[in-house]
Design a protein with these regions (language model features):
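Phosphate-handling architecture centered on phosphoinositide signaling
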Residues: 2-313, 435, 445, 452-484
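Middle-to-C-terminal accessory/interaction subdomains
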Residues: 68-70, 134, 268-334, 342-490
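Short glycine-rich loop/turn motifs
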Residues: 138, 335-337
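Conserved protein-kinase catalytic-loop segment immediately C-terminal to the catalytic Asp
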Residues: 202, 337-342
Length: 490
C-alpha cells in the first residue's frame, strides 16, 4: 500500500509537469531511431473524404490471393486448441507464398492507393508461442526475389536491409506500445535491440489494425547483430542462440551443459548462422563452445581470474539485460524468448525480446512489483553470486533511474508515443475493440477497459516498481554474500 500511495502521488505530480524533452535523455553511445520523434504527427489531407484510409503511419499491404495464412492453431474434438497442431497450406507447407506492398512516404500521409515505396514476393506464416492463439495474429515474413527462388534483403520501413521480419500485432497489450517502447529504450543502452516501426496493416484489402514491424534477432554483413560472417575454412564461427521451445529444424537444436547437468527443461536452438552455413559439425562446435562457457560459469573459478565469467561474457550487457527485465518484471526472460550471442572475436552478450507481457500484463498470476526473480534463472543464478556483478547492477540501476528509467522520462515517453499514434489507436480498436471488454488477465480487476486506462495502468506499475526498487535494490547483495555462497567458493 505504501508504494501504491507513492505511485499515485508521483502520477499526480507528473500531470503538473511540463512535457519532458525526451531527446535530452537519449544517449550518443547507441544512437537509436525513435519513429515517433523522427516522423511528423498526422495532419488531415486536404482531399481527405473521411472514408478512405489516410494515415501518417506506414501502410503494409499483404496480398495472399485469398489464401489463408498457415500457422493458426487447430482445435481438437473437444475444442481444445492448445495441442500444438497448426494449419498448413494446401500442399502441406508451413509457409504461404504471397506479396507485400509498403506505402511509406517520407513526407505527408499514406493511402492504400498510393504508389508503393517497396514491393516484394514473400513467404508468410502466423508466428508466436502463446500469441498465435490470439485473434489478432502476428506474422513472420521472409522477403524473396521476384521469382521466389532466393531470399532478398529489403530495407523495410527504413531499417537495415534484411530478409526476415516479425510483424507484431499488439492484442493482449492494450496500450499497443509495450514492445515499441521497451525495444527502443533497450536500444539506447545496449549494443543492440531489435529496431521497430509502427505501421497499419491491410490483408487482402481488409484493415487489420495497428502493428509493429520488428527486426528478428539475427545478423547480416552490416545489419542487426553485425557478427563476423562464417569462414569456409573453419568450424569456429560467430553465433546467436535462443532459449525457448526449440526449432522445427533439428540441425539448429543443440543440447548444452545447462540442459543435461541442471535439468533445464527449455530447449536451445541456433538462430544464427542460417541453415546454409550450419553443418552438423558446426552445430556441434557451437554446442561445445557454449557448454564450455556454462561449465566455467558453474565452476569454483567462476569469479576468479583468469577463469572468471567476465573473461568470456560482456558484463555491461548482462547487467543491462537484468535491469530492464527486472524493472518491467518481464519474467519470460531467462527461460523463454531468451537470446544470447557471441562474435567469434568477442564476448557473450544478451539481446532483449518480447515485452508483450511486461509490467504486470501476464494473463496470470498478478506480477507483484515488490520482488526480484531473475537471480533464480539459469545463467543469472551464478552471476548473482558474484559481488562484482551485483555491485554493477546496483550502480547501473541508480544511473539509469536518473535518465531513461526515471518516472518523468517513462511517463512522458508513453504520452508522446500515444499522442503521436493519434487516430491509429481508434482505428485499431474499431476492429479489436471487443478486447477492451474482454477480461484476458486474471483476476478480472487487472483488466483495463479503455486504451487510456491501459496506459495509465502501465505508468502506475512503472512508478510503483521504481519506488520499490529504489528502496530495495541493495537487497540483491544477499545473493552474493559469502555466507550464502561458501560452497561455491574456494
Amino acid at each position: 500500500m505504501k508504494y501504491k500511495r507513492m505511485a499515485l502521488a508521483a502520477c499526480a505530480l507528473l500531470l503538473l509537469l511540463s512535457a519532458t524533452n525526451l531527446s535530452a535523455v537519449l544517449t550518443d553511445e547507441h544512437p537509436r531511431y525513435h519513429q515517433h520523434l523522427e516522423r511528423p504527427a498526422y495532419t488531415p489531407c486536404a482531399e481527405y473524404d473521411g472514408e478512405t484510409l489516410c494515415t501518417h503511419l506506414p501502410l503494409v499491404l499483404i496480398d495472399t490471393g485469398g489464401e489463408a495464412i498457415p500457422g493458426v492453431p487447430i482445435p481438437d474434438a473437444d475444442s481444445n486448441i492448445e495441442n500444438d497442431r497448426f494449419t498448413t497450406t494446401a500442399d502441406g507447407s508451413t509457409l504461404l507464398r504471397a506479396s507485400v506492398s509498403v506505402v511509406d512516404h517520407a513526407e505527408g500521409n499514406n493511402h492504400p492507393a498510393d504508389a508503393p515505396t517497396l514491393q516484394s514476393v514473400i513467404d508468410i506464416r502466423v508466428r508466436g508461442n502463446s500469441s498465435r492463439y490470439f485473434d489478432k495474429h502476428s506474422y513472420l515474413i521472409k522477403t524473396l526475389t521476384d521469382d521466389g527462388a532466393a531470399s532478398r534483403d529489403v530495407a523495410m520501413l527504413g531499417m537495415d536491409a534484411f530478409d526476415e521480419w516479425a510483424l507484431h500485432g499488439p492484442y493482449l497489450d492494450k496500450t499497443l506500445i509495450r514492445n515499441y517502447m521497451w525495444y527502443n529504450l533497450a536500444g539506447e543502452i545496449m549494443d543492440y535491440a531489435p529496431n521497430v516501426r509502427f505501421c497499419e496493416v491491410l490483408l487482402n484489402g481488409v484493415y487489420q489494425g495497428l502493428y509493429v514491424m520488428t527486426e528478428t534477432v539475427s545478423s547480416g554483413a552490416d545489419a542487426r547483430l553485425k557478427l563476423t560472417e562464417p569462414s569456409k575454412d573453419t568450424v569456429q564461427m560467430s553465433y546467436a542462440l535462443r532459449l525457448d521451445r526449440g526449432s522445427g529444424n533439428e540441425v539448429k537444436n543443440i543440447e548444452t551443459f545447462s540442459q543435461y547437468a541442471l535439468r533445464n527443461l527449455q530447449d536451445m536452438d541456433i538462430v544464427y548462422p542460417e541453415t546454409k552455413w550450419l553443418t552438423p559439425e558446426r552445430a556441434a562446435w557451437i554446442a561445445q563452445d557454449f557448454s564450455d562457457f556454462e561449465k566455467s560459469l558453474y565452476s569454483y573459478d567462476y569469479d576468479t581470474e583468469p577463469y572468471a565469467w567476465w573473461e568470456q561474457a560482456d558484463m555491461s550487457s548482462f547487467v543491462d539485460y537484468f535491469i530492464l527485465n527486472e524493472f518491467t518484471c518481464n519474467y519470460d526472460a531467462g527461460w523463454l524468448s531468451t537470446y544470447i550471442y557471441r562474435d567469434v572475436r568477442g564476448k557473450y552478450k544478451m539481446c532483449i525480446w518480447d515485452f508483450n507481457s511486461a509490467c504486470d500484463n501476464y494473463s496470470h498470476p498478478v506480477t507483484e512489483p515488490q520482488h526480484f526473480e531473475l537471480q533464480y534463472n539459469v545463467w543469472y543464478y551464478m552471476l548473482s553470486k558474484d559481488e562484482k556483478f551485483i555491485n554493477a547492477v546496483i550502480d547501473r540501476y541508480r544511473e539509469l533511474r536518473q535518465g531513461i528509467l526515471s518516472d518523468e522520462y517513462l511517463c512522458a515517453y508513453m504520452d508522446d508515443v500515444t499522442a503521436w499514434l493519434g487516430d491509429a489507436v481508434e482505428r485499431n480498436f474499431s476492429v479489436w475493440g471487443y478486447t477492451l471488454e474482454k477480461d484476458m488477465l486474471s483476476p478480472a480487476w487487472r483488466n483495463p477497459h479503455s486504451h487510456a486506462a491501459a496506459v495509465a495502468q502501465m505508468k502506475h506499475f512503472c512508478i510503483e516498481r521504481g519506488a520499490w526498487m529504489d528502496e530495495n535494490i541493495d537487497i540483491l547483495r544477499q545473493y552474493s554474500h559469502e555466507s550464502k555462497n561458501k560452497k561455491f567458493n574456494h
